[in-house]
């Protein structure tokens, strides 16, 4: 006998589920441990199989885009840390890159080297974090412990550079706030060795593990057509066999000068995505090893030189009246970019992260829009989960590597 179910949430009041006695409606989250209180999935089940999935988001909404329209360009930078909080440096850079494109700033080479090192270090930290918590979701707890130990070394490096372990705020509009500390590169080289050893250890635990492969292979399959229609990017897209990486297609900073590969998958399933995260760690190590000798050959400033938009060096501010006055105006009133609009895409650890900024020549954006990859990947769950078993839902959600700080903006 058919029954109708109408959800009480106004957002879903028009969604009516019609099913027979063999079907069931299940609310997955937001209380479920794997959804971390940030995702609700309305699942329609036929036995153990999912026949319909409706994601509900908004549990972490903080109005980040609207905040950007009420802050000066420099004031907004710390807010970007709170988007994808597992890779905050990537958020800092994506925002700074958009503003710099709007201002047509030329970034000193030394700052470019430091930025690219930080971005790839941040990518490795984010990837090893994903692998560890994804393995924990599936039940491989020992992987979580080994990976987190190595991740701590990377966070120590970020703390040595910028003073923060999670919300780094390590990028500035026009460059970077600090040069690399003494002996920092030696610590970085040591970390690269630790990361290699950790990666080998994890692969030894997982790659030939029958349970791990059974839980991931042919689970959460994404086709090329599905990936393109949902606007997927990053590893979710490359897992289907499409070799699209913004660092290659629209290179920024020093990526045009660097030699690295873009790994792609064959089947688009959860196991392919896991393998790509592991392979990308190798590529990040390879990139950083090319950047370390580049750093020694640079001696330019670490901030762009433009008195209309960028403060003078601190030693000048402390000793010269003109520099002090210029700094006061930039801090008190904010910079005034030219009228125009820009969209600047970057390749974050999750995929394409870009900021659209529309300027009316005021000290704050007239419109700020964030293109975050996790938003599209969570939306695609309504397609990916159909046909999957309920027991595999956690695996599929985890394999998207979505962070809800950038989903709910």
Swiss-Prot record:
It is a peripheral membrane protein. It catalyses: a quinone + NADH + 5 H(+)(in) = a quinol + NAD(+) + 4 H(+)(out). Pfam families: Complex1_49kDa. Its EC number is 7.1.1.-. It comes from the Bacteria. InterPro entries: NADH_Q_OxRdtase_suD, NDH1_su_D/H, NiFe-Hase_large. It comes from Helicobacter pylori (strain HPAG1). NDH-1 shuttles electrons from NADH, via FMN and iron-sulfur (Fe-S) centers, to quinones in the respiratory chain. The immediate electron acceptor for the enzyme in this species is believed to be ubiquinone. Couples the redox reaction to proton translocation (for every two electrons transferred, four hydrogen ions are translocated across the cytoplasmic membrane), and thus conserves the redox energy in a proton gradient. Its main location: membrane. SUPFAM superfamilies: HydB/Nqo4-like. GO terms for cellular component: plasma membrane. NDH-1 is composed of 14 different subunits. Subunits NuoB, C, D, E, F, and G constitute the peripheral sector of the complex. It is found in: Cell inner membrane. The keyword Cell inner membrane applies. Keywords: Cell inner membrane, Cell membrane, Membrane, NAD, Quinone, Translocase, Transport, Ubiquinone. HAMAP family: NDH1_NuoD. GO terms for molecular function: NAD binding; NADH:ubiquinone reductase (non-electrogenic) activity; quinone binding. This is NADH-quinone oxidoreductase subunit D. The keyword Membrane applies. Belongs to the complex I 49 kDa subunit family. NCBIfam families: NuoD, PRK06075.1.
């Amino acid at each position: 006998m058919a029954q109708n179910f109408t959800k009480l949430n106004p957002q879903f009041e028009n969604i009516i589920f019609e099913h027979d006695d063999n079907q069931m409606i299940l609310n997955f989250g937001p209380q479920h441990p794997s959804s971390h209180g940030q995702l609700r999935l309305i699942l329609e089940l036929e036995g153990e199989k999912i026949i319909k999935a409706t994601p509900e988001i908004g549990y972490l909404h903080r109005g980040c885009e609207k905040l950007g329209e009420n802050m000066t360009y420099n004031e907004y930078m710390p807010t970007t840390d709170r988007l994808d909080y597992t890779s905050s440096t990537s958020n800092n850079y994506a925002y700074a890159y958009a503003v710099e494109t709007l201002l047509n700033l030329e970034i000193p080479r030394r700052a470019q080297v430091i930025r690219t090192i930080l971005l790839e270090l941040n990518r490795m930290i984010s990837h090893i974090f994903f692998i560890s918590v994804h393995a924990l979701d599936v039940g491989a707890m020992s992987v979580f412990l080994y990976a987190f130990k190595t991740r701590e070394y990377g966070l120590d490096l970020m703390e040595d550079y910028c003073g923060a372990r999670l919300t780094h705020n390590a990028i500035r509009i026009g460059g970077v706030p600090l040069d690399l500390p003494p002996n920092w590169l030696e610590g970085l080289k040591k970390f690269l060795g630790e990361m290699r050893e950790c990666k080998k250890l994890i692969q030894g635990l997982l790659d030939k593990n029958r349970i791990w492969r059974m839980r991931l292979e042919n689970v959460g399959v994404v086709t090329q057509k599905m990936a393109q229609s949902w606007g997927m990017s990053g590893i979710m897209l490359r897992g289907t066999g499409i070799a699209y990486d913004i660092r290659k297609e629209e290179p920024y900073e020093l990526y045009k000068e660097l030699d690295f590969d873009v790994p792609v998958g064959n089947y688009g399933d959860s196991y392919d995505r896991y393998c790509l995260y592991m392979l990308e760690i190798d590529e990040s190590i390879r990139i950083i090893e090319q950047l370390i000798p580049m750093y020694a050959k640079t001696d330019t400033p670490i901030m762009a030189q433009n008195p209309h938009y960028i403060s003078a060096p601190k030693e000048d501010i402390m000793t010269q009246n003109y520099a002090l006055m210029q700094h006061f105006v930039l801090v008190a009133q904010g910079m005034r970019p030219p009228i125009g609009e820009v969209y600047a895409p970057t390749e974050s650890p999750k995929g394409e992260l870009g900021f659209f900024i529309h300027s009316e020549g005021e000290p704050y954006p007239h419109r700020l829009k964030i293109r975050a990859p996790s938003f599209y990947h969570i939306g695609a769950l309504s397609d990916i989960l159909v046909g999957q078993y309920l027991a595999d839902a956690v695996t599929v959600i985890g394999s998207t590597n979505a962070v809800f700080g950038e989903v709910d903006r």
